[in-house]
Structure formats: C-alpha cells, structure tokens
C-alpha cells in the first residue's frame, strides 16, 4: 500500500485554488469543480462534497486549529520571500526563521486556516554549510543529516561549474 495524497476540505474552492496557484505556484492536473488535484498529489474538496462523502454526518472541521500542515520546499527562499511579500493579506503564523539545523522556513495560513510551511530544501542548506567551509563532519552535526546525504551534496558541489 502507498500513500496517494492529502486532501484538504475548503469552504471556497475558487479562493483556495487561486491561493495555491498564485502563492505556491501549484499546477492543477485535474479539476472536477468540487474536487481539484494539484501536481504533487494533494487535493482540495469542497466542504459540501465532503459532507456528502460522509453520508451527511456532521463535519467537525478544525479550520485554523494548528494541528497539521502542508510542507513545501523551495531552493531559493529569498526569491520566495520576495514573491510572498506581494500577498500582504495572507496571515502569517511565524516569520521567516532559521532553525538549529540551518533550514529557514516560514509558516502561514491558507484561506481556510490550514497551516502552510515553505522551507529551504535541505540540499540547499547542506551545500550552504559546505560552501561556508564546514567539514563533512561539522555539516553532519549541524544539519543532523547522515554522512551519505552530506557526501552526495559535497560531490554535487565538486561536479558543478
């Protein structure tokens, strides 16, 4: 068995679809009106359709309950942050910050209060450490990533022009 995707229940499909397309650069691969699938396997479904799927049982939606998130990675956080600033109406949960393992990320809400995280890819983080002069061992310790991954990133740096 394999996981096939994540489904988010939304109140306003048009607003949610625009958000994911315009803010997060997601591409729609299937649009059935009440059900939209984006590249990468996550889907949006209208609240009304969700209720029908549940045989009209009450839906205890926890919009904005801060208990789960969709996570995205970007190889250029500075460019993403410049893009993100074009959407002042988006409610931020956390500012852009760097965690102890070196990854920078920001968290904010989609139109229905689902948490969205956009963070640097760890490949970018590890390469940044290596470029700064950290050794393989120091990079492993700081990033908390295994030797094989750090060495793969180091090799990629060696092979790049």
Model-derived features: where do they sit?
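Conserved short beta-strand elements that form part of the metal-binding/catalytic scaffold
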Residues: 27-64, 115-120, 159
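Helical anchoring/docking segments at protein termini
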Residues: 3, 8-9, 29-31, 80
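N-terminal beta-strand motif that seeds the catalytic metal site of vicinal oxygen chelate
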Residues: 1-15, 68-70, 121-160
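Vicinal oxygen chelate
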Residues: 12-14, 65-112, 132, 142-148, ...
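Amphipathic alpha-helical segments
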Residues: 12-27
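A contiguous, mid-protein "functional segment" used to position or interact
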Residues: 107-124
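Short secondary-structure junctions
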Residues: 25-31, 91-94
């Amino acid at each position: 068995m394999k996981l096939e995707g994540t489904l988010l229940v939304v109140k306003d499909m048009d607003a949610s679809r625009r958000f994911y397309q315009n803010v997060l650069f997601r591409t729609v691969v299937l649009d059935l009106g009440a059900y939209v699938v984006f590249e990468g396997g996550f889907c949006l479904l209208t609240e009304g359709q969700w209720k029908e799927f549940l045989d009209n049982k009450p839906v205890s939606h926890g919009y904005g309950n801060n208990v789960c998130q969709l996570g995205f990675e970007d190889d250029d956080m500075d460019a993403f942050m410049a893009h993100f600033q074009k959407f002042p109406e988006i409610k931020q949960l956390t500012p852009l910050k760097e965690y102890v393992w070196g990854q920078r990320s920001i968290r904010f809400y989609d139109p229905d209060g689902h948490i969205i995280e956009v963070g640097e890819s760890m490949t970018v983080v590890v390469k940044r450490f290596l470029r700064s002069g950290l050794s393989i061992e120091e990079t492993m310790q700081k990033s908390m990533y295994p030797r094989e991954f750090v060495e793969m990133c180091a090799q990629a740096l060696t092979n790049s022009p």
